[in-house]
């Protein structure tokens, strides 16, 4: 599997996620492309090629985990080469409204360049469901992106899981890591929605609210 960092971050930011998954016995790779500050289309093409090589070498479809902007790239890779992708898991990724964030300020600070917002056509495409199973992990206390922009159109093999942390905390938050592990543990070709169960439900705000109705 492949773990993609957020805007301005590199593989060092995903060490906790990758280390956690390696301890569970998975073969995990960082994206190996330095800081995530390039034009997204270039990254999508490069990661798609990387995914194709990983599948060729292993004979298995590749799961992609993307944090923030990395999740947007991961989803577009799945849209481009779904035959090579097993599932997508995103962490605080504003694919439903990519402009609903502090990205303009962050981009200018990181690159010294003016942020060029995506075209209406691209915004519309990013929000469309992808053709592989997907789980969006989000938090209402994000602080960087608007949480509603991270919410998927729920349907067959598409879901949203709410946790209680910050945008920066998503890659270290135990419940978020547990969701990732739970999703990856499903047998190939079989997908069921995430259910924390009564013991873990208090750690998941959406489940807690549902149980109180």
What are the residue ranges of the model-derived segments?
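Serine-dependent carboxylesterase/thioesterase catalytic core
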Residues: 1-12, 16, 20-34, 38-133, ...
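Helical cap/lid subdomain of alpha/beta-hydrolase-fold lipid enzymes
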Residues: 79-213
């Amino acid at each position: 599997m492949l773990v993609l960092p957020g805007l301005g971050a590199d593989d060092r930011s995903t060490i906790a996620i990758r280390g956690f998954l390696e301890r569970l016995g998975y073969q995990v790779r960082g994206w190996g492309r330095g800081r995530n500050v390039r034009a997204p289309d270039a990254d999508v093409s490069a990661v798609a090629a990387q995914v194709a090589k990983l599948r060729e070498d292993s004979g298995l479809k590749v799961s992609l985990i993307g944090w923030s902007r990395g999740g947007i790239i991961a989803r577009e890779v799945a849209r481009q080469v779904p035959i090579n992708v097993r599932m997508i898991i995103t962490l605080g990724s504003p694919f439903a409204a990519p402009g609903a964030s502090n990205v303009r300020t962050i981009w200018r600070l990181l690159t010294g360049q003016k942020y060029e917002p995506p075209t209406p056509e691209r915004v519309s495409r990013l929000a469309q469901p992808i053709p592989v199973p997907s789980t969006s992990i989000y938090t209402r206390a994000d602080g960087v992106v608007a949480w509603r922009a991270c919410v998927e159109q729920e349907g067959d093999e598409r879901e949203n899981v709410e946790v209680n942390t910050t945008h920066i905390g998503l890659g270290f938050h135990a419940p978020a890591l547990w969701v990732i592990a739970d999703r990856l543990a499903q047998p190939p070709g079989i997908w069921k929605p995430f259910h924390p169960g009564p013991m873990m439900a208090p750690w998941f705000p959406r489940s807690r609210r549902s149980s109180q109705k």
